[in-house]
């Protein structure tokens, strides 16, 4: 029991901190030291600065050893370790620093010498080639793109070569009679060009091969007058105060209603139908203009909209085009009368001044209008026609006076027969041509009088029945619209099976 209560004794010991004195540098024994060569007594002065202690060395391994810190306070403090719980730290700075040390520092190109441009621009790649930065996915995409380019190039070349094949049908050969079949390069090229033109003709040529329908010549006027719209019959302008405004040219109603008895009136404009149709409804509410043609009926060539009269389905020897742009009549300039643009002058009379000339052509039954228009080329048609008319009138009066002197006792019929006219009777009680000649009236004077009477009749009908005509046309349009809506509803319901069985 005493032994159990006796306290346990332990040997006493002390722990002391070790000294942190720096160790002396290790020195090689004299036996292993390399022999030292004799140094020259006089050495040239170095070109480097004496302050750089790295160059102040001797050929002694012991002396070239890096000196150790003499005291612990002179050693650099240890940098804290990175916290890996926040992720692996970036090594970009170390890589860039190593690359810079490897490639070496380059001084600035202060002279901006183009020959040294490559020394300063490496795009951050160093010695690594450019394709080393391209991923494998990008390489596959580039290869696929090159293959697609090559495929499309070969397909296009093959398609173009296929277009130059011989004509396969008689219709194709008849459509291109000046391009025969054959395997010469010129024939192949012409066939290819013709087929390409046929493909693009859908967008460049008029919508229909015949813009006007076939009609019995006995039921219509023998001559066709084609009129432009913009700056000929109307003029449109825009201002900040009023926006778009459209003005009607002075004398347009008289011009259209008077010449309607001689010509088949056609409106041919390069303005789209969705815009020009609304203007035409206000300009000509009574439908004096028989056929309206819009941009869809023009021909597009070299950046211009051309009015090709050969698509009108009318005899070009009896077609006259009145326009304000020469480009519109480029294909048939011999059929065109080009006027100056009307810019809104309310006192303009140039359009009405053309009526006597146009009336003369239709009233006298000119076989071909093109030589007549050619004779007025480079002149003002109203002024030149007035001069020629005055000369013809003087000549007519002179011949008439001479004929009266030679045959004073002859009647009116003999005088008319001498001038090449036969005595005829009119059913409406009008004066016969022979009677008019006896009174000193030229033939086109009588035609003009008859035209004035017909115009007065047209004006009377419009005044008396114009409102009725407009109401009837509005009712017809509304009926057509209702029928169209009914058809659209029927087709829509039939798509879902709800139509009438």
UniProtKB/Swiss-Prot annotation:
It comes from Aspergillus fumigatus (strain ATCC MYA-4609 / CBS 101355 / FGSC A1100 / Af293) (Neosartorya fumigata). The keyword Ubl conjugation does not apply. It is found in: Mitochondrion inner membrane. Residues 17-146 are mitochondrial matrix. Pfam families: NIF. Essential component of the TIM23 complex, a complex that mediates the translocation of transit peptide-containing proteins across the mitochondrial inner membrane. Required to direct preproteins in transit and direct them to the channel protein TIM23, and possibly facilitates transfer of the translocating proteins from the TOM complex to the TIM23 complex. Residues 34-44, 103-112, 423-434 have a biased composition (Polar residues). Residues 1-125, 423-442 are annotated as: Disordered. This is Mitochondrial import inner membrane translocase subunit tim50. Component of the TIM23 complex, at least composed of TIM23/timX, TIM17/timQ, tim50 and TIM21/timU. Interacts with preproteins in transit. PANTHER family: DULLARD PROTEIN PHOSPHATASE.
């Amino acid at each position: 029991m005493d032994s159990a209560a006796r306290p346990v004794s332990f040997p006493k010991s002390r722990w002391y901190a070790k000294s942190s004195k720096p160790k002396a540098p290790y020195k090689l024994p004299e036996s292993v030291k390399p022999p030292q060569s004799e140094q020259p007594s006089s050495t040239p002065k170095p070109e480097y600065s004496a302050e750089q202690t790295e160059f102040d060395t001797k050929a002694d391994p012991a002396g070239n050893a890096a000196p150790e810190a003499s005291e612990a306070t002179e050693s650099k403090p240890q940098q804290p370790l990175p916290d890996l719980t926040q992720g692996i730290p970036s090594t970009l700075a170390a890589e860039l620093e190593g690359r810079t040390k490897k490639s070496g520092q380059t001084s600035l190109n202060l002279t901006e010498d183009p020959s040294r441009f490559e020394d300063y621009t490496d795009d951050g790649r160093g010695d690594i080639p450019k394709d080393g930065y391209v991923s494998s996915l990008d390489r596959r995409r580039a290869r696929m793109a090159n293959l697609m380019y090559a495929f499309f190039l070969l397909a296009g070349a093959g398609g173009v070569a296929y277009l130059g094949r011989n004509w396969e049908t008689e219709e194709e050969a008849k459509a291109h009679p000046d391009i025969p079949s054959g395997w010469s390069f010129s024939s192949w090229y012409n066939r290819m060009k013709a087929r390409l033109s046929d493909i693009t003709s859908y967008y460049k040529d008029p919508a229909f091969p015949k813009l006007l329908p076939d009609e019995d010549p006995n039921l219509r006027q023998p001559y066709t007058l084609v009129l432009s719209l913009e700056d000929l019959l109307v003029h449109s302008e825009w201002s900040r105060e009023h926006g778009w405004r459209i003005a009607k040219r002075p004398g347009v109603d008289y011009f259209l209603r008077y010449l309607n008895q001689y010509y088949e009136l056609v409106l041919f404009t390069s303005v789209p139908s969705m815009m020009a149709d609304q203007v035409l409804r206000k300009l000509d509410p009574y439908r004096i203009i028989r056929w309206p043609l819009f941009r869809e009926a023009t021909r597009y060539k070299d950046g211009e909209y051309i009015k090709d009269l050969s698509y009108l389905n009318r005899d070009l020897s009896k077609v006259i085009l009145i326009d304000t742009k020469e480009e519109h009549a480029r294909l048939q300039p011999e059929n065109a009368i080009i006027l100056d643009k009307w810019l809104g002058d309310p006192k303009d009379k140039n359009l009405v001044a053309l009526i006597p000339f146009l009336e003369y052509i239709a009233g006298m039954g000119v076989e071909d209008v093109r030589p007549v228009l050619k004779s007025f080329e480079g002149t003002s048609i109203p002024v030149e026609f007035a001069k020629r008319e005055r000369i013809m009138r003087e000549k007519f009066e002179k011949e008439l006076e001479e004929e009266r002197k030679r045959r004073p006792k002859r009647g009116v019929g003999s005088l008319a027969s001498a001038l090449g006219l036969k005595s005829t009777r009119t059913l409406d009680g009008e004066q016969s041509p022979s009677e008019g000649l006896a009174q000193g009236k030229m033939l086109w004077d009588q035609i003009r009088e008859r035209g004035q009477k017909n115009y007065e009749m047209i004006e009377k009908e419009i005044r008396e029945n114009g409102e009725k005509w407009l109401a009837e046309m509005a009712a017809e349009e509304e009926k057509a619209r209702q029928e169209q809506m009914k058809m659209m509803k029927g087709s829509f319901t039939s798509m879902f099976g709800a139509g009438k069985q």
